[in-house]
Amino acid sequence: MPLLDSFKVDHTKMNAPAVRIAKTMLTPKGDNITVFDLRFCIPNKEILSPKGIHTLEHLFAGFMRDHLNGDSIEIIDISPMGCRTGFYMSLIGTPNEQEVSEAWLASMQDVLGVQDQAAIPELNIYQCGSYTEHSLEDAHEIAKNVIARGIGVNKNEDLSLDNSLLK
């Protein structure tokens, strides 16, 4: 099985909250695809609650599009990490970490503006595979934490995992 890029970085050196350009690629037609690691929690020390990350998934995807999409940027997908320490965001375009950070902070403010669980998009049995597993309160706590701590930048060259540790 090939070793994925996300496992070639040293998770013990990651800061959070922080933005990292996880991968860039060029499509055959010349479009730039950028994958961002949006790290909410320090790996192996903090974790997002299942209900909080699920609610955030429903809110964050739309709010980030509101703040980041434009003429040269279109978000393809924002998905939670299985380790529950953040999200991956794939998009067409090449925004820098500062642009992504600003959109992320604005999105967290938007999350705090949602005051009723009924206002969570797609929160119903037809559009969500676990529609009862949500917590607006947990999502608010996550957003407050990001805002209070601020968003830094994780650089791949600072996180390079020594080859002797690759398995």
Curated annotation (Swiss-Prot):
Pfam families: LuxS. Signal peptide: none annotated. Binds 1 Fe cation per subunit. Fe cation binds at residues 54, 58, 128. It comes from the Bacteria. It is an enzyme of class 4 (lyase). Keywords: Autoinducer synthesis, Iron, Lyase, Metal-binding, Quorum sensing. One of its GO terms (molecular function) is iron ion binding. Involved in the synthesis of autoinducer 2 (AI-2) which is secreted by bacteria and is used to communicate both the cell density and the metabolic potential of the environment. The regulation of gene expression in response to changes in cell density is called quorum sensing. Catalyzes the transformation of S-ribosylhomocysteine (RHC) to homocysteine (HC) and 4,5-dihydroxy-2,3-pentadione (DPD). Belongs to the LuxS family. This is S-ribosylhomocysteine lyase. The lineage of its organism: Bacteria, Pseudomonadati, Pseudomonadota, Gammaproteobacteria, Pasteurellales.
